[in-house]
Amino acid sequence: LYDSAGQKGNRNDVTGKKILGYYDVLVPDGRQQPVDIGTLWLRTFRFVQLDITTADEPLQLHELYNDFCAYPFEMKARFDADDASLEAIRHVSWRTARLCAGETYFDCPYYEQLQYIGDTRIQALISLYNSGDHRLMQQAIAQFDQSRIAAGITASRYPSNQLQLIPPFSLYWVAMVHDYYLHVPDTAFVKSMLPGIDQVLGWFERQVNEQGIVANLPWWNFMDWVPKLPRGVPKGATTAEGSAMVSLLYVYALQRAADLHQRFGNAAIATRLQQQIARIQQAVRRGMYQPARGLFADDAAKTSYSQHTNILAVLTHTATQPQALMQRVLSDTSLLQATIYFKFYLFRALKQTNLGHLYLPQLGFWRQSIRDGLTTFPETENKMRSDCHAWSASPLYDLPALVAGISPAAPGFQQVEIAPQPGTLTRIDCSMPHPAGTIVVALRKKADGNSLSGSITLPPGIGGRYVWAGKSRVLRPGLNVLE
């Protein structure tokens, strides 16, 4: 629905607005008995408008209804805290995630309905932490592997009847395989992906210039919908000088691939990947760091600075003072700002630098979207295109993984780490599905505000560790009481 100025405005307000978008033309055949007619493919909607034109005979409309169609995910997680807005965010996020999953994951159910790697990595983690169902994730990983072209990289989206190539998305696929390895006890499947991973990384290795920076990239090198980046492509990505942002994403993938090869006994390959990691990191530190600002630039000429490049510097351990860098990332408004998609990686960096207490104040976009009448979360902050986009459902992962602090401490989730970062919350009751059962975390902040009490319950046969205030405690299967 759009108003006279072409704006959507509050989605609950329909007065004076017009529907502009997809439509179907249905032509009854004139028979007297009732007949069901509908669309040839699924449609997603907030409002439906019927425009009926009759000829010599009236049209009798007996019933208008819809059938809900989605992958059968079941919500098996819980997150309750002393902030009621978080439950509303979870509710809208879950609706968003459900509508973006059918026979494959969708980036959105209204427009492309395509399984894009950048979107799918986030969707898959949401699925694991809330339903425990890894099947659509496994299928997506296999399909992306099948999409690889002869040169070595994956398609940006697959299945699709039109080939599109976004080279950075191939690096997220490598990370997605590593995610699966950490969360799902299925080493045979992960091992079968190693040849494809090597092909992707081999393609990127051939794109590294003499200085050690990824450069001269062909095709569409989208990183984020930053308004000042043409089509979301970072400075230097398609030129000879190269891009720090893409180089660090390459390191991010290399680190995960090296871990996989090391764990599967391919020590020589792991060593070679580690050498490439060191080479790229050294090149980025030498050529892209600006000491006066304490920031990594996007390009060698140091004409562009973004949150993205510095977030990736933190996530890849390229930054030597990661916590201080993250504080600058949040405070320096002159940086190109991460949009809703790349905030997923901003939040991973907050967790990694023990700044997770700053997560809850970052949820303004989600709270405002609900006030704007959205019942699903949109693609970008301007809220003018896709009103339902799966990557914006990331709080469903952030709340258990960052705030409650639940993450794998060993492959296949065979060990668990609970490292909560509750911020201003004084109470957290969280549970999530695990391959061996259910993880339950119940925490209460004590009166001093600096310590926690409560309990952590792990599935049978699953141990782990509890991390708080720089100290670690062993967790055993079953109930663990925190005094």
Task: List where the protein language model places each region.
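Alpha-helical support elements that line or immediately flank enzyme active sites
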Residues: 1, 48-53, 118-147, 177-184, ...
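Non-catalytic C-terminal accessory modules of carbohydrate-active enzymes
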Residues: 5-7, 263, 275, 282, ...
